Regions:
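Intrinsically disordered, low-complexity proline/glycine-rich segments
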Residues: 15, 22-192
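Intrinsically disordered, low-complexity segments enriched in serine/proline and basic residues
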Residues: 4-8, 15-22
Length: 192
């Protein structure tokens, strides 16, 4: 017999016998969370790579266009449904990227005009970013100042590897799309 756990409205973990396997990971504040490990695998040709959870299960697949200008990426969930489309907007003075989510919403990453260090901003994201977005070490907060996700870059890897912890699963698709877009922009900037 297996035990399952869930959180009741007060945030207390409730355990009950079940024939199905259900696993919740809790952060120190008692919130349910999902953790993903993302390894950068961008190349200039067509690419396809998986984003796995902390148990090694494939939750998302990223597929890049082949010989398409401007290059675009499509993110699929584990069932093969489109989660988002990432594309570079052509014919702009400074680089700008659009991320369209499957629910019809979209947000943008755009380069700001600066003289010393590259700076980017996210427009229409609906979340506040705290930390350094380009070093992949930041938190995303909602309008009530609740942390909905945390992204941290892991050191000592041959490729860019980062951990994505999502505390509110309703934001999973948006957070994964944002991270893939940031990684893509970072790859383009380092190759230019």
């Amino acid at each position: 017999m297996r035990m399952t756990s869930s959180l009741n409205e007060g945030g207390t973990a409730v355990f009950r016998p079940s024939d199905k396997e259900l696993v919740f990971y809790l952060d120190s504040g008692g919130k349910a969370m999902k953790t993903y490990l993302v390894k950068q695998k961008f190349r200039l040709g067509g690419e396809r790579f998986d984003i796995k959870d902390d148990r090694g299960n494939v939750d998302y697949q990223v597929e890049g266009s082949f010989f398409q200008i401007p290059k675009s990426f499509t993110i699929y969930d584990a069932q093969g449904q489109t989660v988002s489309q990432i594309s570079k907007i052509f014919l702009t003075f400074l680089p700008r990227f659009e991320i369209k989510l499957s629910d019809g919403t979209s947000f943008y990453i755009r380069k700001k005009l600066t003289f010393f260090r590259d700076k980017y901003e996210c427009d229409n994201l609906g979340l506040r970013i705290e930390g350094n977005i380009w070093d992949l070490n930041f938190k995303l907060l909602d309008d009530r100042d609740q942390v909905v996700a945390e992204i941290t870059k892991e050191l000592f890897h041959l490729t860019s590897t980062y951990q994505v912890s999502v505390y509110d699963e309703a934001y999973s698709d948006l957070v994964i799309s944002l991270c893939v877009a940031i990684d893509y922009v970072e790859m383009l900037e380092s190759s230019s």
